[in-house]
C-alpha cells in the first residue's frame, strides 16, 4: 500500500519525521510530496527542502521524496497512491484538514485521507514556530533533524 504525505515542509520538523516513520510502519511505502507553492515565499527553496527531507529519511527504506505543484489529488493519482496522510496536532487542525479531505474526496472519490495524531512529544511543533525560535537564537535541536538545524542556524546567522 502506498500513502502520499504532502506539505510544504518549510522546514521539515521532527513531528513531520515522526509521522513519516509511523506511516512507513503502517502503510509500507510513503511518498513525501513537497509542494512548490508559488503563492508563499518559503524560507528554503524547493531544492533545499527536498535535500533536507532526503537526508532526514535516508535511513528509511520505503520512502520516496518528490516535488509537485497543483492539486494534491492529482499528485496522488500520478504516483499511484490512493491514500493521503495528514497529521493532527489539535482540534483546530482537524477542522481545517477535514474540509481539505472532503474537497479532495469530491475531486477524486478513489482517494482516502488518513489522519494520524501527532506524537505528544511534537504536538506543539510547527514549521513557523521552529523558524521563529531559530530566528531569535533559541535551541531547536529537539525540534528538527540535524541537517535542518544547521541550515536554519546558517539562514538566521547574524553577521
Curated annotation (Swiss-Prot):
Binding-site list for ATP: 8-9, 16, 87-89, 97, 122-128
Keyword Transmembrane helix: no
InterPro entries assigned to the protein according to its UniProt record, in alphabetical order: Cyt_trans-like (IPR004821), PPAT (IPR001980), Rossmann-like_a/b/a_fold (IPR014729)
GO cellular component terms, A-Z: cytoplasm
Reaction equation(s) it catalyzes: (R)-4'-phosphopantetheine + ATP + H(+) = 3'-dephospho-CoA + diphosphate
Enzyme class: transferase
Residues annotated to bind substrate: 8, 40, 72, 86
Domain of life (superkingdom): Bacteria
PANTHER family: PHOSPHOPANTETHEINE ADENYLYLTRANSFERASE
Gene3D superfamilies, sorted: HUPs
Cofactor: Mg(2+)
Protein name: Phosphopantetheine adenylyltransferase
Amino acid at each position: 500500500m502506498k500513502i502520499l504525505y504532502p506539505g510544504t515542509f518549510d522546514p521539515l520538523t521532527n513531528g513531520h519525521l515522526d509521522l513519516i516513520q509511523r506511516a512507513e510502519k503502517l502503510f509500507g511505502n510513503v511518498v513525501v510530496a513537497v509542494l512548490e507553492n508559488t503563492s508563499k515565499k518559503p524560507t528554503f527553496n524547493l531544492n533545499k527542502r527536498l535535500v533536507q527531507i532526503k537526508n532526514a529519511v535516508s535511513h528509511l527504506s520505503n520512502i520516496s521524496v518528490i516535488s509537485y505543484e497543483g492539486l494534491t489529488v492529482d499528485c496522488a493519482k500520478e504516483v499511484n497512491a490512493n491514500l493521503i496522510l495528514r497529521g493532527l496536532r489539535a482540534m483546530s487542525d482537524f477542522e481545517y484538514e477535514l474540509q481539505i479531505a472532503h474537497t479532495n474526496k469530491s475531486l477524486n472519490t478513489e482517494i482516502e485521507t488518513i489522519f494520524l495524531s501527532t506524537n505528544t512529544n511534537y504536538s506543539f511543533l510547527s514549521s513557523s514556530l521552529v523558524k521563529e525560535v531559530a530566528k531569535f537564537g533559541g535551541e531547536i535541536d529537539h525540534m528538527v533533524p540535524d541537517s535542518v538545524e544547521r541550515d536554519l542556524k546558517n539562514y538566521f546567522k547574524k553577521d
